[in-house]
Amino acid sequence: MCDDDVAALVVDNGSGMVKAGFAGDDAPRAVFPSIVGRPRHQGVMVGMGQKDSYVGDEAQSKRGILTLKYPIEHGIVTNWDDMEKIWHHTFYNELRVAPEEHPVLLTEAPLNPKANREKMTQIMFETFNSPAMYVAIQAVLSLYASGRTTGIVFDSGDGVSHTVPIYEGYALPHAIIRLDLAGRDLTDYLMKILTERGYSFTTTAEREIVRDIKEKLCYVALDFEQEMQTAASSSSLEKSYELPDGQVITIGNERFRASETLFQPSFIGMESAGIHETCYNRIMKCDVDIRKDLYVNTVLSGGSTMFPGIADRMQKEISALAPPTMKIKIIAPPERKYSVWIGGSILASLSTFQQMWISKQEYDESGPSIVHRKCF
């Protein structure tokens, strides 16, 4: 199948960031925004070598003159031409490899439409001439990265969150739930509540500033009401942040109000249950015999679970819902921002996995639908 000396490529395509690197590494080599930008205006300078599109960090840095598009919305690829550009950029510019020489492991959102997996497979074999490929479910990889094969994963990135119960390595599809509430919504909500304080953030460029404020200063309160009272009566929770132009702004209760949306989606007008309740409901959807294994293996994954205090709060909230004698353990690995990628790196370097790859030959014989038979 694949020679031992050729490292497999692992590419985790998130709604917000692409994480890419080589199987066997402990962290991705390349992490860049999943964006494709096209010039808004006609170029006027002769010989400037105008490009018709920019990808990732370059698009981000030139965002003033570009229209930015995210080809992955809510975890699912919606624009295949742009997606191809992102993969091209990943292989040739970021990793600097020839894709026809390396097997590639891609990740997909749970409940990804069948046609999407087929399209991914087709592009890898027909556009990039991959020798072999595989598509793995993101949440399952996060669980592998934590050294488990059974557990319930709450995976929350920039565009989508999923709660996925997994038993002995298999995701239980009837109990999976997707929640379109994730990092981007928290950033938007933080923009809104900062406006109430008198700071105006409106453009896409300013949204990046607010995202940075969120990542640096926000946290999850153990007791929201209590924290609101503390914030009202003293300035102990206030922190200052310097904007790129040197202006300094102060933020107080916004630090935990933004992240509280995960537990109370009604803050942004969503009629959904909070993440603690969702996890509990999904466990209850599973067979009664495996529930206690899920309670003690509740794994957090993805960038939007990086808020300080989130694990303690989950522990407290789920304990309140679960039977009183039930042992509950929330696992929040420090590297959870990249745990999907790390799980992919582990999986693709296992000797037992090598027969799982879909080879070019198998693809030529069966066509794109082979992905449903070999990847589950």
Curated annotation (Swiss-Prot):
Kindly state which keywords UniProt assigns to this record, in alphabetical order: Acetylation, ATP-binding, Cytoplasm, Cytoskeleton, Hydrolase, Nucleotide-binding
List residues traversing the bilayer: none
Enzyme class, spelled out: hydrolase
What PROSITE patterns does its record include?
Answer: ACTINS_1, ACTINS_2, ACTINS_ACT_LIKE
What GO molecular function terms would the record report?
ATP binding; hydrolase activity
Instruction: Give any Gene Ontology cellular component.
Output: cytoplasm
Chain residues in the propeptide:
1-2
Name recorded for this polypeptide: Actin, cytoskeletal 3A
